[in-house]
Amino acid sequence: MTRRILTVALVATTVGACRPLPPGVRAPTEIWAIWSPDSRGVSMPDGFAATAETWITIDTISFRPTIISRVADDGTSLGQQSAAGLVPARRASVITSFQGTRYHADVIRALSENADAVGVTAGAFASLLSSSRAQAVILDFQEMAAEDLEMLMDVSRAIADSSRAHSAAAIIMMIPAADSAAYPARTLGRVADLLLVKLFPEHGVTTPAGPIVSAAWFTRRLGQRASEAGVNRVVAGIPADGIIWDRRGARRISYLDAVRLAREASTPIIRDPASGNLHAVSSRDGWDIWLVDRELVEKLIDEGRRIGVTRFALFGLEGADPQLFEFVRRARSPKL
């Protein structure tokens, strides 16, 4: 029995075997990199336990898989050339209903109406994933409604079953933090090995300016989802960049661009004591910036660990505080 538990604890540090750990087994902290579809050409630091480097969408007409982004085109996993002796990052692929500028929930609905089409699409995804040597599959079907749950389950289950039949890839489902009606954790856990909970934005591009994610908001939402699914089956999604609100609207901004704008406006970037976010305002230039940095990410990971969650996924890394990557490298032991 002891040998079995030790084996599970060791293989669970890789995404290729990221099934939930048995109760009582304390895993080390895992930090994943969720690279955006527009991340091509960015510097790819080492230290991550897993990297989502390929994005595949469902074509709105044919329902066939279409690769919209592949960060690494040379066949290597990110982190493979680590000089620090870190274990190479396990690669994951994201299957998403996002295309253009929005999620297409209508594609999932239409696909679910034809069982044959679901089977063909699932098989096509499985073949593509097998050829890409993905060790994990992240299903990203956001902005569905509560009445769509059965359709969401049908499509997700078909893709998951087909993927498992073709490879040992783990299945992860990305879900929002707050919408338990459309994305009930216990139900979705019947399909997915892990649930990646996006714990942001508290304030985003569709809201007035404010903290992107505060520690209190993060802890409350993560605690709710962890209680639904179990701490061993949750991955906490954390933002790593910022948002600027100005006369043109709101959009994401990188840490370095935010620092540059603040310097040009002779405006200090201060830490908001209530949320822990960095904040800068320029009345002269008409913008308001809220920003995530290394210190905030460390705090959020500490809060998640107190709850019992051990897996964390960082989004928006192409715009992150450069010091964050040093934290990731130090957080991941070469002995894993």
Roles of regions detected by a PLM:
Residues R3-T7:
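N-terminal export leaders
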Residues V15-A17:
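C-terminal motif of bacterial Sec signal peptides marking the signal peptidase cleavage site
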Residues P22-T121:
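Glycan-recognition patch characteristic of GH18 chitinases/ENGases
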Residues W35-A49, N114-S130, A178-R186, V292-E303:
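Short, acidic/polar
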Residues T54, L139, L195, A236, ...:
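Conserved, mostly hydrophobic/aromatic
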Residues R64-G75, E150-A262:
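Substrate-binding surface in catalytic domains of secreted glycosidases
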Residues Q99-Y103, I238-L300:
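Glycan-binding loop/region signatures in secreted carbohydrate-active enzymes
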Residues T121-M151, K198-P201, A313:
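Active-site groove signature of glycoside hydrolases
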